[in-house]
Amino acid sequence: MKKLSTNQIRKIWLDFFISKNHYFLEPVSLIPVDDPSLLWINSGVATLKPYFDGRKTPPSPRLTNSQKAIRTNDIENVGVTARHHTMFEMLGNFSIGDYFKKEAIELAWELLTDKNYFDIDKNKLYITVFNEDIEAYNIWKDVIKIDEDHIFRLSKKTNFWDVGQGPCGPNTEIFYDRGEIWDPNKIGPRLISDDIENDRYIEVWNIVFSQFNNDGNNNYVELPRKNIDTGAGLERFASIFQNTPTNFETDIFYPTIKKVEQLTNNQFKYSIDNYFNPNKKQTRINTAFKVIADHIRATVFAISDGVFPGNKDRGYIIRRLIRRSCVFGNELGIKQAFLYKLVDSVIESMKEFYPYLVDKKSLVEQTIKDEEEKFLKTLSKGYDLLENIIKTKNTVSDKDALLLFESYGFPIEQTIEISELSNVTVDIEGFKKLLEQTKQATRNARKDLKAWDKQNELFTKLKVESEFTGWSEISRDNAKVIYMFTDQKQVESITDQEVFVILDKTPFYAEKGGQAADSGIIFNDQMKGFVIDVQQGPMHQNIHRIKVQDTLKLNDLINCRVDEEKRIYTMKNHSGTHMIHYALREVLGSSVMQSGSYNDENGLRMDFTYHRLPTNQELLKAQNLVLEKIKNKVDRQTYFCSLEESVKKHQALAFFTEKYDEIVRVIKFGDFSSELCGGTHVNNTSEIEDFIITGIESKGSGLYRIKCLTSFKTVNEYLNEQFKIYKDQAEIIIDKYNQNKDLLKNDQLENIYLEIKNITINKDNLILIKDLLDKLRDLNKDYDKKVNDLITANKLLKYKDLTPSLNKDNVNEIKLETTDLNIRDLKQLADDLRNKYNDLIVILLSSTNENNFIVVAVSQSLQNKYKAIDIFNNLEGYETKGGGNANLAQGKFVKK
C-alpha cells in the first residue's frame, strides 16, 4: 500500500470525485450560518442541509468536499483514545437526487482499491450493511464480488442513520484490517460483528442511503428524491497510510508534539513504543502531548474563523480547550504561556489546503497568548484551592471536583493524581453524575438537532424559473404570474387572501445577503395586491407574499411597483455597510471579519469579529473615512465573474461562509471596497449623502455589532432626537440644582449646563455633548453630596449639645429618640458623637412618617466588652431588624 501524506490523501480524494463529475465545495467556516440548531459545523454534510432539504438548489447534484468540523460533547476522551479529536476533517461525496446505492458503492470501491488512487489491498477491507438492506448486501456480494465472510449484516443500532424525524436510511460501512499486531487478544472479525472498540479494524468510510422520511413516530415513507451522504475521516486515513499506532503520530499532529517536546527543554518525551508496551507514567505523559496537539489545532482554526475565547457558547469551548491545554502543559513542566508558540506548527502542516491561516497567524498567536496569561493566574488559584481541600477534608467531593474542572480547568485525572499523593480520595462517580447533568442541561438548552426538516415536496418539485430585474428597475409592467400556492398547496386562483406568487420577471428584491426584502404593490384592471414580503426559493425564484384584493389568477399579467422610498434608503444603507466594512478594516486591520449584517430603509447594522472593542477614537476615524469616500463621489462598478476571478482580479472579500454560485456578482467602489454581493446599491457614494455611527455593542467574546445611519434626512432626524434627549437630561439636573441653589451655588455646573443648552446640533458636537453631559452628571453627583452634607449638618445643629450619661454598667452612653432624622443622618450623628466623646456607646432612634430607623455605635476602646451588633439585637423594649458589626449596627425597629 502507498505511503501518503495528509495533503496527498485529500488531493487524491477530491481529484477522483471531480473526475467523476462532482462539484468541489470549498471548505466553509466552523461557524454555522442560519442554523441555530448547531453550535459548530459538526460534520461534512452539516453545511449541505439546505441542499438536502430542498431550501436551496445545489450547484450540481454531485458534490464533494473536505470539510473541517468540531465536536466537543466528549472532550474528556481526547488524548485518551487513539482516534478522538475536537476538530477533524471529513472527506465526503454526496448525491442529491442523482446516483444511489450501486454507483455510490462502486465509486467507493474504485477509489479505495484502484492502483491509480489509494491502491488498498481488497482482502483487507470488510463491509457492514443493515440486515434488512438486501439491495446493498447484493451489490457488495454480486457486483463488487466481496467474499461473504467479509460482509456483516448488522442491526439498526449500528447501520441505520435515523435521528427521530426527517430524512433517514440504512448505511454501509467500510473497515480496513491493519493486522493481528493490533489485535493482541486475537479476536478477529468478531471485533466488527460485535461492535467492539478496537485498533485493528478501522472504519474508513460510512455511506448513508437517505431514502426514507421518518414522521417522528417511526413511520417511514420513501422520499421523493433519494440522496447519498458519505463521510470518511481524513485523520483515520492518514493513520492507515502512514502506519501509525494512533492518529497522533501522523503528519497532522506529530510535528506539533515534537515542538512541545522542545518547549519542555526535552525533559519530557512522547513515546510511540508506549502503545505496545504501556507504562502508566508514560501513558499520562503521552496523553498530555496528545491533548495539547489536538486542542491547539482546533483553537487555531476556530480563532481564524472568528471565534474568540469567552464565557458562553463557542467562545467558552475555545476557552476550555486553551485552559485544558495549559493544565496538561503544566504537567509537562511548562509553567509559562506556551501554546501560542505552537500556532506556527499547526499552520505549517495545514496551510496547503487552508492558505488563509497564514494571514491570521499574528491575530491567533496574540489571542491565545492573552488567554493563556490570564488563565495561568487562575490555574495557580486552582492548585491553592485543591491543596486547601486536601488539607481539610478526607475526600474531594463531587461538587469540589466539578468546580475545579469547570472553573479552574482541572481534568478529573489531575485532581485524582494530586489527591492520591496525600491519600485523599475523590468522589469520581458523583463527579461523573454532576458532569453528565451539566452536559444534559446544555444539550436541552441548545437542542442540537441533527434532524433536518421534512422535505418540502412542493419546494423540491418547484422547478419554474424566474428572473430578478430589480438591479436596474423598480417597476415592471406585464409580469406574468407563473406559480401560486398557499399552505403548501398549489392554486390557480385566489380571492381576498394572502398567497405566495412567483412571477416570470420581477423587480422586487428577496430578502438575502443581509438586505431586507422590497415591498410595494401589484395591480391590473381586475385586482390590486400588496407585496408584504419576498423570500428566495430553491432555484433562486423570488417568492412574493401578497395580500390580494379581488381576484388574482395563474397566468395573469400584472404591473409591479416597488416602494421607491424604501428601496432608495435601503440601497443607501447597504452601500453604507460596504463602506463601514472597508473603514473598520482600514482602521483596525485585516483581521476584522464581517460575520453578518442587516440593512433596511431605517438603518444598518454589521456584525464583525475582532479581539477587542474598538475605541471611540477608532470609531470616529472609521466614520470620517466613510464620510470622505461619500464626499469623493466614487462610482460603483459591478462585475459578473467566477469566484476565482472575483478574488484574483477584483480582490473581492467574501466573508461569513456564504455559499456562492459558479458566477458571482462583485460590487466595487473605487480601489478600496470590493465585495461579493447580490444586493441593491447606490450608483455613486455621494448618493449615500451622510453617515454616522450610532452605537456598538458586544454580541459575545470577540464579536461586535456596529449600528449606523445614512442619508441627510435620517442622520438629521437622529441628531435632533439625540440632542433633545441629552438636553432634556441636562434640564432635569439643572431643575434639581435650582431647588438648592440658595443653599449652595456652583458656577461650573451652571456654565456646563449653558454649554449644553446652547450647543449647535451637528455630528461633530455629538461626542462633545455626551462628554459635557457626563461632566455635568459628575459635577451634580459631587454637588448632591455637598448639599446633602449641608442639609444633614443643619439638621444636626440642634443636637450639638447632647452629652453622655452613665448607664447601668457605669459606661458613657447617649440615647436619643427623635422624629426628623433619616438613616444617613443618624449615622453621621453617631460618628460626630464618637469623635467628640471617648469610651462611648451611642443609641439613636428616629421615627419618621415612613420608617423607624435605628443606629447603634460603640467606641473602639469598648469593643472588647460591648459590641454594637449585640446591643442592637438585644435592645430592651425594641424589636430590631438589620445588621452590622462590633463598631456599628443599623436597621429598623418596632417598639414592643
UniProtKB/Swiss-Prot annotation:
Zn(2+) binds at H574, H578, C677, H681. Its EC number is 6.1.1.7. It holds the Pfam family DHHA1. It catalyses: tRNA(Ala) + L-alanine + ATP = L-alanyl-tRNA(Ala) + AMP + diphosphate. PANTHER family: ALANINE--TRNA LIGASE, CYTOPLASMIC, ALANYL-TRNA SYNTHETASE. GO terms for cellular component: cytosol. This is Alanine--tRNA ligase. GO terms for molecular function: alanine-tRNA ligase activity; aminoacyl-tRNA deacylase activity; ATP binding; tRNA binding; zinc ion binding. It comes from Mycoplasma capricolum subsp. capricolum (strain California kid / ATCC 27343 / NCTC 10154). GO terms for biological process: alanyl-tRNA aminoacylation. Binds 1 zinc ion per subunit.
